[in-house]
Amino acid sequence: DMAAECKLARETGYLAYKTKGRPWFDIHEQLRQSCAVVPEAFKIDMDFNDTLLDAERALPILRELEKHPQVDIYETPIPQSDIAGNRLIREHTRVAIAMHYRKPPPSIQVREGICDGFVIGGGASALMRSGAFAAEASMPFWLQVTGSAITAAWSLHFGGVLSHAIWPAVDCHQLFKEQLLTQPIV
């Protein structure tokens, strides 16, 4: 239940929550319930994994969801290869659009104005290269490096040195029963 997860996230100190926008859930009702239990300052990011198919179908849904002030980022609402469609979505929503780094190439993403920032993951060298490009392009991003609390601690170091890693990070360490650290990440 998304509302319970948002409430728990806020109670444990998180300022944002990332969820999957999926057609088998009533996303409008889930969002309504979630926004009722968290303040406007708490942000909800929605990852559609291109399930909204194209801009014509996506925009009515996205425009309705953006009425909730908590909605802050849409990740990949339609296929990233649809440059014209993504540009249209970006131009017609107040919500930031995030795209996975490298598809299409980030220079095209920036030049064509199809996103507001990136989802960046990978190993140490890739993170540093991608983060440097994002800084040069003045594009924010979130680090998406998932694993145990050890991985989360490793990712936190990159978040501390990459100037544009300012969107909420995704590391998923909370899903592990054993954290593998002697002191928890707070």
Model-found features: residue ranges?
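Metal-dependent enolase-superfamily TIM-barrel catalytic cores that perform enediolate-based chemistry
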Residues: 1-89, 93
